[in-house]
């Protein structure tokens, strides 16, 4: 039960850190290559 409570307390923290890193990475890629994410039809 103690391990489960530890998991519940660390998973949101790890998720927040991972999403922050991913968002920052996408923003930096979009800063250097601004047209990379655009779709042209």
From Swiss-Prot:
GO biological process: photosynthesis
Membrane-spanning parts: 7-27
Entries under SUPFAM superfamilies matching the protein: Subunit IX of photosystem I reaction centre, PsaJ (SSF81544)
Keywords, ordered alphabetically: Chloroplast, Membrane, Photosynthesis, Photosystem I, Plastid, Thylakoid, Transmembrane, Transmembrane helix
Coiled-coil residue windows: none
Similarity comment text for this entry: Belongs to the PsaJ family.
Lineage, highest ranks first: Eukaryota, Sar, Stramenopiles, Ochrophyta, Bacillariophyta
Membrane topology term: Single-pass membrane protein
Keyword Acyltransferase appears in the UniProt entry: no
UniProt source species: Phaeodactylum tricornutum (strain CCAP 1055/1)
Protein name from the UniProt record: Photosystem I reaction center subunit IX
Places the protein is found: Plastid, Chloroplast thylakoid membrane
Domain of life: Eukaryota
Function field: May help in the organization of the PsaE and PsaF subunits.
GO cellular component term of the entry, any: photosystem I
Pfam families: PSI_PsaJ (PF01701)
């Amino acid at each position: 039960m103690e391990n489960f409570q530890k998991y519940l307390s660390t998973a949101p923290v790890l998720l927040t850190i991972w999403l922050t890193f991913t968002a920052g990475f996408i923003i930096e890629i979009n800063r250097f290559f601004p047209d990379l994410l655009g779709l042209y039809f």
